């Protein structure tokens, strides 16, 4: 019986099985940022320990960085202190730090791949929920907490429970105006926000194989929103072509050896899976969330669910809670719901291909007068490339604010926040209560092109209609 990529990579990195039943796993790459890492360095300092393998740890700034004015010192003294603490710790411990002057700063899950740090067959850890993004390369990547960040810094290992593996097979051709974001929202909608608990998700099938690396990253990024700690795609020629020539990618003879390893860790044709889910891509439409979890999603042409339409009382309660918070009426179309803010960016959809796709759609259009629209590149490299192509001008001419790189409005850890009851059409990954800064602010998740359509119309709209897709 063959093995899945997950099992191959796990077995190659397993140090030993602990008395608890967990496995001690060697971590090939450790990515850190300013929010969950300074405290871990402090724990190390208190214990009199040093970073075990500083050459395998890389730091950046993303969560708290202002995207309108990055001049230091930041107005937020707490944020300024966190940046200083991380910089000091990295200097003391010999850890590479991509700060605002490095030219390489950006969201951790965007700079890892673009620098070639993220590689197939690796185990990757980061103190951030969306570390599963790196699984797009055929890596086993997972988010960890601050104490686990400490453990990786001190030992380059983690104690983890082995997961089951679910194969999600997506076949068929996507319709016009349908993107990777729509697929992952549909997967979460079908399987639920807890459906992946205890599983690693392996994404495959002709649809996924036809995706670019950036589309695969969008898909893997939101695995955790469906309860799966790990999500990955088997590496292939698309992966290798993306990686070749990246700053930290292997070179020369090392490249050829790496290719041999990378090819070997792909799932065997006769690999055994604990579960298989099959999805027809042609049936997926542009998808938006209507509630307060990513699983509360519908096609843009559907009506918002009504509590009375379900028989399960707990489901009814969840619907009522979501409708009350979102100020929506069950049984009414989601299309036409007024928005106040539009946000394109985040580790889900803040890459060059995202901005290219939106730019080609919004030319000749203008953001509605009452909408505040932000376009936030995910890294300095993305910003440079987009600006070299003139994409920033397209966004500005359409009425978007073109910002500096950072996590921005994905979460409430920087100045980019919702105010009051504002509703945001967002290309990010979470629509929890208060996620974007205001305790009554509302978030509707969708693809970047759908965000652009909402920005232009001033309300949730079908991008296929707005842009004639």
Swiss-Prot record:
Pathway: Amino-acid biosynthesis; L-leucine biosynthesis; L-leucine from 3-methyl-2-oxobutanoate: step 2/4. It catalyses: (2R,3S)-3-isopropylmalate = (2S)-2-isopropylmalate. The keyword Transport does not apply. InterPro entries: 3-IsopropMal_deHydase_lsu, Acnase/IPM_dHydase_lsu_aba_1/3, Acoase/IPM_deHydtase_lsu_aba, Aconitase_4Fe-4S_BS, Aconitase_4Fe-4S_dom, IPM_dehydratase_rel_enz, IPMI_cat. Its cofactor is [4Fe-4S] cluster. One of its GO terms (biological process) is L-leucine biosynthetic process. The keyword Amino-acid biosynthesis applies. CDD domains: IPMI. GO terms for molecular function: 3-isopropylmalate dehydratase activity; 4 iron, 4 sulfur cluster binding; metal ion binding. Belongs to the aconitase/IPM isomerase family. LeuC type 1 subfamily. HAMAP family: LeuC_type1. This is 3-isopropylmalate dehydratase large subunit. It comes from Sorangium cellulosum (strain So ce56) (Polyangium cellulosum (strain So ce56)). The lineage of its organism: Bacteria, Pseudomonadati, Myxococcota, Polyangia, Polyangiales.
